[in-house]
Amino acid sequence: MNKEEILEAIKNMTVLELAELVKALEEEFGVSAAAPVAVAAAPAAGAPAAAPAEEKTEFDVILQEVGSDKIKVIKVVREVTGLGLKEAKDLVESAPKPVKEGVSKDEANQIKAKFEEVGAKVEIK
């Protein structure tokens, strides 16, 4: 399997399948996917003034407020992230907290819509 075939397979995966893939890669290689995202975001902060003219391509979805129906919000967190029940509950209870990082604008808006349907307040950065 070459690089292009791998990328094509990843493009055809659902968000849940991608979350499972990331978790499997983390376990297999003993790494954390969170570290490279933070490192990749750091150079943008020190970029020259010309950089802000570029359109942002990666967005973070941050759960700001849970709203009145915490159980439905936990279900959406599990659906979006692929987290287990306890991890999703902990994330919801520690809001404001990033739910998904480094996603496309379309995906971020879809995630935001899912949370707003269940009464949660979400911010896209």
From Swiss-Prot:
Domain of life: Bacteria
Stored InterPro entries: Ribosomal_bL12, Ribosomal_bL12_C, Ribosomal_bL12_C/ClpS-like, Ribosomal_bL12_oligo, Ribosomal_bL12_oligo_N_sf
One GO process term, biological-process aspect: translation
Record-annotated membrane-spanning stretches: none
Keyword entries, A-Z: Ribonucleoprotein, Ribosomal protein
MF terms (GO), sorted A to Z: mRNA binding; structural constituent of ribosome
One Gene Ontology cellular component annotation held by this UniProt entry: cytosolic large ribosomal subunit
Cross-referenced Pfam families: Ribosomal_L12 (PF00542), Ribosomal_L12_N (PF16320)
UniProt xrefs under SUPFAM superfamilies: ClpS-like (SSF54736), Ribosomal protein L7/12, oligomerisation (N-terminal) domain (SSF48300)
Subunit structure: Homodimer. Part of the ribosomal stalk of the 50S ribosomal subunit. Forms a multimeric L10(L12)X complex, where L10 forms an elongated spine to which 2 to 4 L12 dimers bind in a sequential fashion. Binds GTP-bound translation factors.
NCBIfam families named among the record's database cross-references: L12
Stated role: Forms part of the ribosomal stalk which helps the ribosome interact with GTP-bound translation factors. Is thus essential for accurate translation.
Family designation: Belongs to the bacterial ribosomal protein bL12 family.
Name this polypeptide is given: Large ribosomal subunit protein bL12
